[in-house]
Amino acid sequence: GSTIGSVVDSWIVSSLAPTQRIEGPRLDSLRITSSTEGAVIPRVFGRMRMGGTIIWATDFREETRTTTQGGGKGGGGGKVKTTEYLYFASFAVALCEGPITGIGRIWADGKLLDTAGITWRWYPGDEAQTADPFITAKMGAANTPAYRGTAYVVFEDLPLSNYGNRLPQLSFEVFRPLADPDTAEGLTRAVTMIPASGEFAYATQAIRKGGGGAQVSENLNALSDTPDMVVALDRLQAIAPKVESVSLVVAWFGDDLRAGSCKVRPGVEVSAKSTTPASWSVNGVSRASAFLVSRDDQDRPIYGGTPSDFAVVQAIQVMKARGLRVTFYPFILMDVPPGNTLPNPYSDNAAETGQLAFPWRGRITCSPAAGFAGTVDKTATAASQVAALFGAATPASFSVSGQSVSWTGTSGDWGLRRMVLHYAHLCAAAGGVDAFLIGTEMPGLTTIRSSASAYPAVQAYRALAADVRSILGAGTKISYAANWSEYFGHQPQDGSGDVFFHLDPLWADPEIDFVGIDNYMPLSDWRNGFDHADAAEGWPAIYDRAYLQGNIAGGEGFDWFYASATDRSAQVRTAITDGAGKPWVFRTKDLRAWWSNPHYNRP
């Protein structure tokens, strides 16, 4: 009875106790009290972070939120009623003279603004833009200017609670390429999409790792609500609107410079990671069973992982949907870490221990390599090493289900053919691509000989091209992307004086549609200051257009070359000559002569 009485007493007392009321801060005025009249409208060229000027605003909108707490256990204790005042601002900010091509990041009070959930839009500032519909609804059509010629941004109901119930200081990343078509932005027609690695770098949907409230975005680094791939394409097309074609680079990992021992596999950054709404998978290989890339001395992965297959499909489809032509570019990153104990093929009898760390894929070759004691070059052993690198995959070694491609061949086959044919199937599953490369920059491989004049890798690439054609069909252009030092021929450095146009059988193959060259030919030999050869010839600067144009079909690789590193340091130049009267044979830059003249081997 006493317990019941106590509860009743508490209820009576609490019902008689006054309710405690707490109110948060409230603004005395809901108006923006300052503006700028007569401010200069800036001009922007390129990309710039800049502030702006408010050109229109409504009064702040006030929202009241009341919560009640208290009563205590059994109804005891007084109540606490809390009232908060929330404020929202709708306004427009003029940025610069238009037209601009895009807005990138936005900062509020110096911090990146998370635009997820915020209603905002931008106007380019051209002479055809129409009035903003939100401003029109507030002001009426007759009273709403279109602000033609001025780029501006409109925010609707921006929450102000994080900024002390005031408008934050806003700044914007603005893109405005030069109107002059004779600029990099105006002239660029094709680009390469890298980094080639990154497990979800090419995904067009947001990918998050972890579970519950601890999720972290994998591919929302540029903007908080837009995948990086989409941001990259938006900015590309805004900055370089004439771009028509994109090469999509996707990497697997090689682990040895010896062709006969090298495995080429898809890799991951960590072997255990949960991601949503999609998991990593390449060629049917799961994360747990994939090759794990090397890590540095701070336990960070040296490379990003191979892009997941679904991300590659998404990238191809989104680029095609934007009207871009897609070239697929398979890439090999060499994961040979420092301190390795692998036999070095670039040593006599391959007896030296330790290969160069993280080398260029173009150094994959036979072992021992040509030019070293014990070399297997020009022997049947070299051919068998090349065959081991390519592997035995066929177009039938894969299972295709929708947009998923899995391996059904021999489990230990990690050859080049498996990689390339996998991506041929994947590109077909994505709806096709405009061009497909069967290999890129492999001079150490393509110059391997099985006899004095037989190049087994060249024949292997021809067979691979035919298999890729059977998957992708006649609508896809197929080629090999030769290194700039590789495309024109092979001149063995053995004192023989031999000259072979070793890639000609590949270039002439009916399944090859064009000559592909990764062109990094030297365009200048300018040194610091003016005490050097090119300045002595009267050229005023490295940026001089005539100087650079003169080195397209001239200068290093055309008129002369450096015979050694010592000669390069001292600018001791050796003229390119040919006793047979055809110096173009040795000119890496002489594309015109290489294309125009008959090719004759000089064994």
What is each of the regions a protein language model found here?
Residues 3-189, 194-200, 211, 215-218:
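Polar, S/T/G-rich
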Residues 4, 225-232, 308-315, 382, ...:
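Stable alpha-helical elements in mature extracytoplasmic
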Residues 50-71, 124, 198-209, 257-279, ...:
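Internal, charge-rich low-complexity segments
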Residues 81-99, 174, 213-241, 295-312, ...:
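Short linear interaction motifs
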Residues 181, 385-603:
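Noncatalytic carbohydrate-binding groove/subsite architecture in carbohydrate-active enzymes
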Residues 189-210, 244-453, 477-485:
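Substrate-binding cleft and catalytic face of glycoside hydrolase catalytic domains
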